[in-house]
Amino acid sequence: MNIIIFSLMTISFLRARFGYEKEILPMMDTASDKSYLQGPPNPYTATVNPLERLISDTYLKVTGILSHYFAYYQENVAEFRRWFQSIYYEMDDDTRKKILNELNLNLRSMDDLENFWTETQGAILKGNLLELSDLLKGLEEAVNAKTHMSSEANNDLIKSKINFKDKAVDFLNQLNKIYGFLDLGLSYHTSNRFTDVHAMFLDAAASKKKLDKSFESISGIDD
């Protein structure tokens, strides 16, 4: 249920901002379904510039992956729910430690992570990360090209939007940080470091709160 609510909130925001009607399916194997990156035809998307479209594609992809971890921790860890409903965008060390202690309390082997891995679609994470990596590379190239154009511009109106560079770089840094958490979590799972797995996926899920704020800040800045 949390995944569905999470997905509908994300879709509603993108539809309102971009006329965007992609669908996040909670149990969809996005690693094999390449049509996911295209989405259904939409007459409104003609008004969206390529950089905005790439930003929304990448945001939608990463939040689709995070939805499973977000739902798992929301449903199973009361302390995570309390933090997520708080005013804070970053998780403090004490809260993080308390949550991890609870998650790791009964872990004795990799077998104890089987339910977590199934519910969060761990089997398709590698494929999803490959797709996310491609999107991040494309977005980084587009942002670099755009910020270079802004720095060379002489028009005062264009220069007034120079803060786009800072916001875009911050957004990219957050996305790359989340990718790093997910990739390391996968690596820990593959190498049977079962007591380290939750730490990385918790950090990734917690990062969503700040990412949402960054996305709202950057959306429309280049209109």
Swiss-Prot record:
A motif (HBM) lies at residues 207-214. The keyword Phosphoprotein does not apply. Keywords: Cell adhesion, Signal, Sporulation. Residues 1-16 form the signal peptide. This is Spore wall protein 26. It comes from Nosema bombycis (strain CQ1 / CVCC 102059). One of its GO terms (biological process) is sporulation resulting in formation of a cellular spore. GO terms for cellular component: spore wall. The gene is SWP26. It is found in: Spore core; Spore wall; Spore, Perispore. The lineage of its organism: Eukaryota, Fungi, Fungi incertae sedis, Microsporidia, Nosematidae. Spore wall protein involved in the adhesion to host cells surface. Microsporidian spore adherence is an integral part of activation and host cell invasion which requires the extrusion at the spore apex of a very long and coiled structure, the polar tube, through which the sporoplasm is pushed to enter into the potential host cell. Its main location: other. Heparin-binding motifs (HBMs) are characterized by an XBBXBX or XBBBXXBX sequence, where X is any neutral amino acid and B is a positively charged basic amino acid, and are defined as the consensus sequence necessary for protein-heparin interactions. The HBM motif is involved in spore adherence to host cells.
